[in-house]
């Protein structure tokens, strides 16, 4: 069975003053607080979420 590629995403900037839609995207990725890291599968929809909120995140492949 092949291993799926994962991406580690960390929230590095506060959500204060950001657009409501960006806050919902961050919540949808499972990020809750500053410096919280989650591992997500490398999928086009996840990539789109990362691109939309890239200014708030640190991404490791």
Curated annotation (Swiss-Prot):
Domain of life where this protein originates: Bacteria
Molecular function per GO: structural constituent of ribosome
PANTHER family on file: LARGE RIBOSOMAL SUBUNIT PROTEIN UL30M, MITOCHONDRIAL RIBOSOMAL PROTEIN L30
Name of the molecule in the record: Large ribosomal subunit protein uL30
GO aspect biological process, one term: translation
Cysteines joined through disulfide linkages: none
Similarity comment text for this entry: Belongs to the universal ribosomal protein uL30 family.
Summary of subunit composition and partner proteins: Part of the 50S ribosomal subunit.
Keywords noted in UniProt: Ribonucleoprotein, Ribosomal protein
Pfam family, one: Ribosomal_L30
GO CC terms in record: cytosolic large ribosomal subunit
Membrane-spanning ranges: none
């Amino acid at each position: 069975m092949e291993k799926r590629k994962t991406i580690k995403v960390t929230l590095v900037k506060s959500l204060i003053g950001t657009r409501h839609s960006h806050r919902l995207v961050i919540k949808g990725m499972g990020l809750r607080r500053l410096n919280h890291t989650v591992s997500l599968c490398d999928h086009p929809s996840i990539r789109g979420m990362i691109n939309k909120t890239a200014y708030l995140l640190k991404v490791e492949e």
